[in-house]
Amino acid sequence: MDIRICLLLAAEAGLALVLLWSAGVLRKPAHVLCAALLLAAAFVLRGLCLNYETSDYTQFLTVWVDFFRTHGGLAALRESVGNYNVPYLTFLALISGSSLPDLYLIKLFSIFFDVVLAWSVMQLVGLFRREAVWKLAAFFLVLFWPTVMLNSALWGQC
């Protein structure tokens, strides 16, 4: 795996840490250490899945990215490409101009939304429980939930 992909994955883990810090749940050193270790584990597990190619990727997603790459990127959105929603096709058009492998960019995009989902659930739990430990538990339960992890890191679904 390209070092740039590893750095992008680490940046997503860093974003998760910043979100936890800004939510005020990392005020105790023990919480910071625990969160850092759990984030490292969550993102290492995701990193181990990144090389896996699904038939959805090989038969559709990479074909669509190649279409965008050869037909002018965003300009190709005028043509009928794929059967996904327009925002996701726009993302595919945007990454078509990158020199990074599209498999990893697609999965990193999905992993980004794992963090958004975990943060959102943490915020929801915070409406009912004020204690940081409950919020952290909600965040990490979502981040480690098998379907969440497999959907993004292994299957590349958003």
Q: Can you name each region flagged by the protein language model?
A:
Residues 30-31, 104, 130-137:
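Membrane-helix interface segments
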Residues 15-20, 105-129:
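Transmembrane-helix motifs of polytopic, lipid-linked glycan transferases
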Residues 1-7, 85, 149-158:
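Membrane-interface micro-motifs in multi-pass membrane enzymes
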Residues 20, 24, 45, 49-50, ...:
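Membrane-water interface at transmembrane helix exits
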Residues 60-70, 75-105:
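Short hydrophobic/aromatic helix or loop-helix immediately within or flanking a transmembrane segment
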Residues 42, 134-158:
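Membrane-embedded helix bundles of polyisoprenyl
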Residues 2-9, 86, 100-119:
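Loop-to-helix entry region of an early transmembrane alpha helix in multi-pass inner-membrane enzymes
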Residues 4-59, 111, 144-146, 150:
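Transmembrane signal-anchor helices characteristic of membrane glycosylation enzymes that use polyprenol
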